[in-house]
Swiss-Prot record:
Gene for this chain: atpB
Family to which the UniProt record says this protein belongs: Belongs to the ATPase alpha/beta chains family.
Pfam entry (one): ATP-synt_ab
Protein name listed in UniProt: A-type ATP synthase subunit B
Keyword Oxidoreductase set for record: no
Subcellular location: Cell membrane
Primary location recorded for the protein, binned into one broad class: membrane
Protein keywords: ATP synthesis, Cell membrane, Hydrogen ion transport, Ion transport, Membrane, Transport
HAMAP family linked to this entry: ATP_synth_B_arch
Length: 465
């Protein structure tokens, strides 16, 4: 039996972000805790583990300056809830949902559990419909589909923050009068990065349709566990109560996983791979699986989690487990970045598993599926020939091989590369793909039907013009 409102001053131990409260009764897992210091400062926490007469509590604002003798703890009998309202659009919050933009507190229309309501798999609708990001390497080659979860695998020092801000500004659903919103959650970012995101949203007016949650690097790591769940709860409210198409961008999931490891170590749990907890797969799934569409509802939640791979290692537990749960990946390349190409998206290891269901006639354009396959094949051939040239020299290549080499260079410089403020439509992206393929002999375009060549190839379009 729960006994909400019971207050205790029986804190026996404080270590890391956790504290142990003894002599408790009727405490439940996940229950919200109010903590008061001797000076009257109030903090919030959550029950991580409840035993017969003892509770382990994680303190969201950190345990600094807490004293076991003078700290009082009250168990509320409720789970952690976030106040939600349409007034949250255009606002900036910290990692636990408190406004940090100088605006007033949110007057909630409702309070929702941050862990969301379980969704019956049968109630899910299959993700379809194209989301235009304005980035050619994504729209043309690794298309984002409404209701999909498509992570970006990056490395330390690569411009994933710029790409995240660009996608958040430019993303849109084509066609009818769809309401579109962006929920942006940043975990463990620096002040400089936080200012970059705020400035980027405010200068372009994108803030009007966005909700920002910013957990800074010097905020307690424990808050990072809550931040993505806060963001997703707001996204579910906008999508399923107000029929909005919501794009959720989570950065950096590596910082989230590090916070998870820190709490696991503090609880003295048996570590899994590289010290991460054995339940990290399940924990990540509770975040990623909140993307999708629901039958009978117009709204949708599309996720783009961003993570930096430690040592650029795609087999590291964080990208490895993320890849199992999500539906593809966008991979950023250090080699392309060194060439001065932005965004440095390597399209060959990148993949969107749901792309085939979101492109083609009636969604993007009839030639899109075959055009993207032909671009992949031609670019892969050009990359392979580069390796060969490094061994035997360019003199050993045939005329066609040289054209493939030129195509690969132009593909990187003209198709993948674009300005940070450049918002390309899907028509512009596909037309650019055809212009690059015109570099090759028509006999090499084996993956595209003749009718599409006659309709879209620059040689024939000029004749029609």
């Amino acid at each position: 039996m729960l006994m909400p409102g019971m207050e205790y001053s029986t804190v026996s131990k404080i270590y890391g972000p956790l504290m142990i409260v003894q002599g408790v009764k009727g405490v439940a897992y996940g229950e919200v805790v109010e903590i008061e210091t001797e000076s009257g400062e109030k903090r919030k926490g959550q029950v991580l583990e409840a035993r017969q007469d003892m509770a382990i509590v994680q303190v969201f604002e950190g345990t600094r300056d807490l004293d076991i003798k003078t700290t009082r703890v009250r168990f509320t009998g409720e789970t952690l809830k976030v106040p939600v309202s349409m007034d949250m659009l255009g606002r900036v919050f910290n990692g636990i949902g408190k406004p940090i933009d100088g605006g007033p507190e949110i007057i909630p229309e409702d309070r929702r559990d941050v862990h969301g309501a379980p969704l019956n798999p049968v109630a899910r609708a299959y993700p379809r419909d194209f989301i235009q990001t304005g980035v050619s390497a994504i729209d043309g080659m690794n298309t984002l589909v409404r209701g999909q979860k498509l992570p970006i695998f990056s490395g330390s020092g690569l411009p994933h923050n710029m790409l995240a801000a660009q996608i958040a500004r430019q993303a849109k659903v084509l066609g009818e009068e769809e309401q579109f919103a962006v929920v942006f959650a940043a975990m463990g970012i620096t002040y400089e990065e936080a200012n970059f995101f705020k400035k980027s949203f405010e200068e372009t007016g994108a803030i009007e349709r966005a909700v920002l949650f910013l957990n800074l690097a010097d905020d307690p790591a424990i808050e990072r566990i809550i931040t993505p769940r806060m963001a997703l709860t707001v996204a579910e409210y906008l999508a399923f109560d107000y029929d909005m198409q919501v794009l959720v961008i989570l950065t950096d999931m590596t910082n989230y996983a590090e916070a998870l490891r820190e709490i696991s170590a503090a609880r003295e749990e048996v570590p899994g791979r590289r010290g991460y907890p054995g339940y990290m797969y399940t924990d990540l799934a509770t975040i990623y699986e909140r993307a999708g569409r629901v039958r009978g509802k117009k709204g949708s939640i599309t996720q783009m989690p961003i993570l930096t791979m430690p040592d650029d290692d795609i087999t590291h537990p964080i990208p490895d487990l993320t890849g199992y749960i999500t539906e593809g990946q966008i991979v950023l390349s250090r080699e392309l970045y060194r060439k001065g190409i932005y965004p440095p998206i390597d399209v060959l290891p990148s993949l969107s598993r749901l792309m085939k269901d979101g492109i083609g006639k009636g969604r993007t354009r009839d030639d899109h599926p075959q055009l993207s396959q032909q671009l992949y094949a031609a670019y892969a051939e050009g990359r392979s020939l580069r390796d060969l040239v490094a061994v035997v020299g360019e003199e050993a290549l045939s005329e066609t091989d040289r054209k493939y080499l030129k195509f690969a260079d132009r593909f990187e410089r003209e198709f993948i590369a674009q300005r940070y403020d450049e918002d390309r439509s899907i028509e512009e992206t596909l037309d650019l793909g055809w212009e690059l393929l015109a570099e090759l002999p028509e006999s090499e375009l084996k993956r595209v039907r003749k009718e599409y060549i006659l309709k879209y190839h620059p040689k024939y379009r000029k004749r029609e013009g």
